[in-house]
From Swiss-Prot:
Protein name: Phosphoenolpyruvate-protein phosphotransferase
Enzyme class: transferase
Family of this protein: Belongs to the PEP-utilizing enzyme family.
Record's miscellaneous remark: The reaction takes place in three steps, mediated by a phosphocarrier histidine residue located on the surface of the central domain. The two first partial reactions are catalyzed at an active site located on the N-terminal domain, and the third partial reaction is catalyzed at an active site located on the C-terminal domain. For catalytic turnover, the central domain swivels from the concave surface of the N-terminal domain to that of the C-terminal domain.
Gene name tied to this protein: ptsI
Keyword Transmembrane carried by entry: no
Signal peptide segment: none
Listed SUPFAM superfamilies: Enzyme I of the PEP:sugar phosphotransferase system HPr-binding (sub)domain, Phosphoenolpyruvate/pyruvate domain, Phosphohistidine domain
Length: 572
């Protein structure tokens, strides 16, 4: 048997025949010399848009019926993209230049997808697949090239593809499709979300998988471990089927951990909250019984607008999430734009190192009118729930003092008394080292582990050449986190975490041992986190982290935790 390792995005084990899907090919260049008046072009494009919207409504209905309401809402987002003035205006500009609709659609949607794919934030990065899904659909109507018809599958298969669009995933028949393998995609892509909703295993990030696996041959997929097996012997198939039974038992056990409140065996309560990227994500978080929102990214409000969103638009979004959370804490991060997150209506200055430049709190302190609008919306929304306001990318005490002064000024304009908790993201080493000073001015810290790791090891986590330096369990990072927690405790400030490390099951006992009281993650990760927490004691965690801090490498710490889990019979 041969094995390939990828990124598991939906748990489960399956063994079935490979069904390879080829990406549709559109010969866009042949339309370069096809003449059409702007009026004719607009009529043709309008027809394609109407067909797309009709199809998406039908796919949504099927998805809600076969999967759930939340999965269906993905296609509301697709329809919103088609109605986005930025997209429609760019297309109209091209048509007015006598560019054929096929070429115009290809230009605009490819450029938009590229913009998202180059973003560092995984949530926004993976929206590129949604744009490309619509790109394929529109080109299909305009050129007559048919899309892959997955409804015709009538036997047990594992789909193998370069990528699966959300609309393709929605039409998969769970009776026959036992899992899928793709070259592209990530944990927060809509196709991955759909797979989890359908409860079928899925693995992404499998380079050249369509050429390594033979169509019609037996393949195995272990979604939790990210393992693909092929070229099976009969013994291999028997072994995989046995593992499938164990996996099924594990998944059934996970379903026991639905309670919002979770404690360690010795009664230490841990807040397991959810990260969301927009208002609709809140519904899935509520379905998974989240204990509040540890990170609400507000960038979507700005990136989906034609201009800086006004106070009323922001207020409605914040109010809705706060109301859905009832009285649970909702931490809303102020605008974190810049770096790889750009706006169509704002020209960022050229920078050699944009990730270390004009972004997040540095930008909003400079553009105070924009910042005040957001702060006013947040203050108004604070009447509707338990609000936490969090400032990103704070590097120095001076920055924090400046931003607090601005917030106080806005409060005075409102004549408002404080109805919120105030915190900062700790994602820059200078802030971690100064936590004792910063803690005097806030109510909470939330460690942004993704950037803290990146800046601590001077390694771009999206750069494959240095990805080996993404080491969340490295003792150096654990020591930095320890400083943050201790600095907070000196000022009665609690510390949580909202980066990917918070959902890393190997990291959880270490984080609890260091003193974190809140872990925020994607909704789908919460069951596993609750399970780990419920099977350990806080004293065990403290003892474990003491040992970890004496080690010298990420791999050594990982082995330490692995042995701890074995002794505790924790199956992950």
């Amino acid at each position: 048997m041969k094995k390939i390792i990828g990124i598991g995005v939906s748990d489960g084990i399956a063994v079935a025949k490979a069904f390879i899907i080829q990406t549709p090919q559109f010969d866009v260049k042949k339309y370069t010399n096809v003449k059409m008046t702007p009026t004719q072009a607009k009529k043709l494009l309008s027809s394609a848009f109407q067909k797309a919207k009709k199809d998406l409504e039908e796919i949504k209905t099927i998805t809600v019926k076969n999967i759930n309401q939340e999965a269906g809402m993905i296609f509301d987002a697709h329809i919103q993209i088609l109605n986005d003035p930025t997209i429609t205006e760019q297309l109209e500009q091209q048509l007015n230049k006598n560019i054929h609709p096929v070429i115009a659609v290809d230009n605009v949607f490819q450029q938009t997808a590229l913009m998202f794919s180059e973003m560092d934030d995984k949530y926004f990065k993976e929206r590129a697949s949604d744009i490309l899904d619509l790109h394929q659909r529109l080109l299909s109507y305009l050129t007559g090239v048919k899309l892959n018809d997955l409804i015709r599958i009538k036997s047990d298969v594992i789909i193998v593809a370069n990528d699966l669009t959300p609309s393709q995933t929605a039409t998969l028949n769970k009776k026959y499709v036992k899992g899928f393998l793709t070259e592209s995609g990530g944990k927060t892509s809509h196709a991955a979300i759909m797979a989890r909703s359908m409860e079928i295993p899925a693995i992404v990030g499998l380079k050249n998988i369509t050429s390594k696996v033979e169509d019609g041959k037996t393949v195995g997929i272990n979604g939790r471990k990210g393992i693909v097996g092929f070229d099976f012997s009969s013994k291999d198939i028997t072994q995989w089927k046995q593992e499938k039974e164990l996996e099924s038992n594990f998944q059934n056990e996970l379903k026991q951990y639905t309670n919002k409140l979770v404690k360690t065996l010795d009664g230490y309560e841990v807040i397991v909250a959810s990260n969301i990227g927009n208002v609709k994500d809140m519904d899935l978080a509520v379905e998974y019984n989240t204990n509040g929102i540890g990170l609400f990214r507000t960038e979507f409000l700005y990136m989906s607008s034609q201009d800086w969103p006004d106070e009323s638009v922001q207020f409605e979004a914040y109010k809705t999430v706060l109301q859905k959370a009832k009285n649970d804490l909702v931490i809303i991060r102020t605008l974190d734009i810049g770096g790889d997150k750009k706006l169509n209506y704002f020209q960022f200055p050229h920078e050699d190192n944009p990730f270390l430049g004009y972004r997040a709190i540095r930008l909003t302190l400079d553009k105070q009118a924009v910042f005040k609008t957001q702060l006013r919306a947040l203050l108004r929304a604070s009447d509707y729930g338990n609000l936490g306001i969090m400032f990103p990318m704070v590097a120095t005490l001076d920055e924090l003092v400046q931003v607090k002064q601005l917030l106080t000024k806005v409060q005075q304009e409102f004549n408002e008394t404080k109805k919120f908790k105030l915190g900062i993201m700790i994602e820059i080493p200078s802030a971690a080292l100064a936590a004792d000073c910063l803690g005097k001015h806030v109510d909470f810290f939330s460690i942004g582990s993704n950037d803290l790791i990146q800046y601590s090891f001077a390694a771009d986590r999206m750069n494959k050449n240095v990805s080996y330096l993404y080491q969340p369990l490295n003792p150096a990072l654990l020591r930095l986190i320890k400083l943050v927690v201790e600095g907070g405790k000196l000022n009665n400030v609690w510390t949580g975490m909202c980066g990917e490390m918070a959902s890393d099951q190997y990291a959880i006992p270490l984080l609890l041992g260091l003193g974190l009281t809140e872990l925020s993650m994607s909704a789908s990760s919460m069951f596993k986190a609750r399970m780990v927490i419920a099977k350990i004691t806080i004293n065990e965690c403290k003892s474990l982290v003491e040992k970890a801090l004496k080690l010298t490498s990420d791999s050594a710490v990982r082995k330490l935790v692995e042995n701890f889990f074995k002794k505790k019979n924790i199956f992950i």
